[in-house]
């Protein structure tokens, strides 16, 4: 058990003019897709008592769901809170709420830094958000309240989906047990804990009934799903059960730690037609020296072996990964191991970011911190290489047919994604059609041209599913 502070400012007189049920609520969600799910749950909990608006300028209550993962994310969160604080002067905002990882980590500092914040919530306080707002408005609370909570808690419940209606994320677990030396997430989010399978299936069924065609499974480590509550890893069973839901056409899995990918999971990916042949595998580095310093539970040999197995057993598999460059003590030789690895194995989707020295992490205290200029140069070199690899891979797609999940029309052409493309992070397929096509439909498209990352195609069948 631990205590989470909910800081409530004293200047509440201005909020007594109207009943809370008349207020409009606007949400600004920052950070990862797991944070987005939290934002959707918050809106779901508030939707019966408040009117939801997607324009903060029209909102009486503004919620900023922050990210506190790396320095740039923290700065973006602070800048956004300050921007929304100005809405209390220039627009309708009467109540500013900050929540999420940054407030969980830096609640006291934020209270001093940004006194315009009226309420601060930690990452597990969402169940009481309506009660807290009502008490604040009614003036019945003192400046500070303490809530006890167990890190067994998982935020669940009704959601207001904020993504394209044809796709939605489903968080299957909360927290993390990995304790990588550069990462603060386990201290913020707590230990790894899986959701019950029946709750996930019910949520997926509800999403399907609302028109969702693609569900994207997320967690800090999806491959560990079930190990804590069922006694063994059970992601393959979850995939099998989810694929039985009528209306769900694609099931995508993100955040699979390489050392936890297991045979039954690979078999299910290979054999289940609804499970797209796409895995997000956060490798982070390929040098054994750096992997050890990062506290990763794998090795270069094991990573390469897992990639080879996946490609042998699932020939059409698309692998996405990320690398951290400029980690403490990373030499040119260590960095070049990543470069050589990418040249040889040509992963389809790669992202990179520079190491961020996060306080309260072991890596922050390591000797051998790398200059920012060197970090940025390594990131630039890596992404330039990957751009060339992506162009090479894309050229091989010319003439191929893909089922495309349509996501919209930009005024000139339609756009959507093949199974090789995850929402928000990957490219699109652009195509024209004489017929009107609705979002969420599947069409068969032949690729005729490539861009740096996007593909251009022509429709050969305007209703393939």
Swiss-Prot record:
What molecular function terms (GO) are annotated for this protein?
4 iron, 4 sulfur cluster binding; aspartic acid methylthiotransferase activity; metal ion binding; protein methylthiotransferase activity
EC number(s) recorded for this UniProt protein: 2.8.4.4
User: Any idea which UniProt keywords this protein has?
Assistant: 4Fe-4S, Cytoplasm, Iron, Iron-sulfur, Metal-binding, S-adenosyl-L-methionine, Transferase
Per its UniProt entry, which superkingdom is the organism in?
Bacteria
- Keyword Transferase annotated: yes
Spell out the GO cellular component terms annotated for this protein, sorted alphabetically and separated by semicolons. cytosol
Cofactor binding mode and count: Binds 2 [4Fe-4S] clusters. One cluster is coordinated with 3 cysteines and an exchangeable S-adenosyl-L-methionine.
Q: Domain TRAM: where?
A: 395-461
UniProt domain Radical SAM core: residue ranges: 162-392
All copies of the MTTase N-terminal domain together span: 23-138
Catalysed reactions, as listed in the record = L-aspartate(89)-[ribosomal protein uS12]-hydrogen + (sulfur carrier)-SH + AH2 + 2 S-adenosyl-L-methionine = 3-methylsulfanyl-L-aspartate(89)-[ribosomal protein uS12]-hydrogen + (sulfur carrier)-H + 5'-deoxyadenosine + L-methionine + A + S-adenosyl-L-homocysteine + 2 H(+)
Q: Which InterPro entries does this chain map to? A: Elp3/MiaA/NifB-like_rSAM, Methylthiotransferase, Methylthiotransferase_CS, Methylthiotransferase_N, Methylthiotransferase_N_sf, NA-bd_OB-fold, Ribosomal_uS12_MeSTrfase_RimO, rSAM
Could you confirm whether the keyword Cell inner membrane appears in this record? Answer: no
Q: Which annotated residues bind [4Fe-4S] cluster 1? A: 32, 67, 101
Subcellular localization(s) per the UniProt record: Cytoplasm
Question: Where is it predominantly found?
Answer: cytoplasm
The UniProt annotation places [4Fe-4S] cluster 2 binding at: 176, 180, 183
What's the family? Belongs to the methylthiotransferase family. RimO subfamily.
What is known about what this protein does?
Catalyzes the methylthiolation of an aspartic acid residue of ribosomal protein uS12.
What this protein is called in its record is Ribosomal protein uS12 methylthiotransferase RimO
Could you tell me which species this protein originates from?
Clostridium beijerinckii (strain ATCC 51743 / NCIMB 8052)
